[in-house]
């Protein structure tokens, strides 16, 4: 199954908008560490992994992902690891043509940038309040 990648130039993405859809292989945590094919859907805030038609999807939310590490390129596969905030490593591989690693990395960067922009006004407000003089006639150390 070929992956379908849809990258839009819109600055605001909804969490339901599908950015990429297709097949990805996940290495199992079992003793033999076999590669299992998963149907995957990438949105602006998560990666959904489907094992079968009836089982519910496992979701990796971007707020719990620290980074995506590209481990190895071969002629057939790209091996990469998703590292969670708790430093759990989840190994994946995809065909070179599918570019899943790049799609997930770009979506994660976009998510982190949107989150930083949302937090910026709050940070700026907290910073300006901490720099205000405590008494009306008092000047800050940086003032004239």
Curated annotation (Swiss-Prot):
Entry's induction text:
Maternal Phlda2 allele is activated, while paternal Phlda2 is repressed due to genomic imprinting.
Consequence of changing residue 38 to A: Impairs the ability to rescue growth in cdc25ts mutant yeasts
| GO terms for cellular component | cytoplasm; membrane
Gene Ontology biological-process entries: animal organ morphogenesis; placenta development; positive regulation of apoptotic process; regulation of cell migration; regulation of embryonic development; regulation of gene expression; regulation of glycogen metabolic process; regulation of spongiotrophoblast cell proliferation
Q: How does it sit in the membrane?
A: Peripheral membrane protein
Phosphoprotein among keywords: yes
Q: Mention one GO molecular function.
A: phosphatidylinositol phosphate binding
Give the observed phenotype of the deletion mutant: Mice are viable, and show overgrowth of placentas with expansion of the spongiotrophoblast. These larger placentas do not confer a fetal growth advantage.
Q: Which residues form the PH domain?
A: 18-111
Instruction: Give the UniProt subcellular location, in the record's own words.
Output: Cytoplasm; Membrane
The residues the entry assigns to the signal sequence are none
The organism sits in which domain of life?
Eukaryota
The outcome of changing residue 27 to L is:
Impairs the ability to rescue growth in cdc25ts mutant yeasts
Which of UniProt's keywords are assigned here? Cytoplasm, Membrane, Phosphoprotein
Similarity comment: family membership: Belongs to the PHLDA2 family.
What other comment is given for this protein?
The Phlda2 locus is imprinted. Loss of imprinting results in overexpression, leading to placental growth retardation phenotypes.
Q: Domain comment?
A: The PH domain binds phosphoinositides with a broad specificity. It may compete with the PH domain of some other proteins, thereby interfering with their binding to phosphatidylinositol 4,5-bisphosphate (PIP2) and phosphatidylinositol 3,4,5-trisphosphate (PIP3).
Q: What is this protein called in UniProt?
A: Pleckstrin homology-like domain family A member 2
């Amino acid at each position: 199954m070929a992956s379908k990648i849809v990258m839009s130039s819109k600055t605001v993405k909804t969490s339901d908008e599908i950015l990429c859809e297709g097949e990805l292989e996940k290495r199992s945590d079992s003793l033999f560490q076999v590669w299992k094919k998963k149907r995957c859907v990438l949105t602006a805030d998560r990666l959904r992994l489907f094992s079968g038609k009836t089982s519910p999807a496992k979701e990796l939310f971007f707020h719990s992902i620290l980074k995506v590490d590209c481990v190895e390129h071969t002629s057939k596969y790209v091996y990469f690891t998703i590292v969670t905030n708790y430093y759990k490593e989840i190994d994946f591989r995809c065909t070179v043509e599918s570019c899943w690693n790049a799609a997930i990395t770009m979506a994660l960067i976009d998510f982190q940038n949107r989150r930083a922009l949302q937090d910026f006004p709050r940070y700026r407000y907290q910073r300006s309040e901490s720099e205000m003089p405590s008494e009306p006639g008092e000047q800050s150390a940086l003032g004239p």
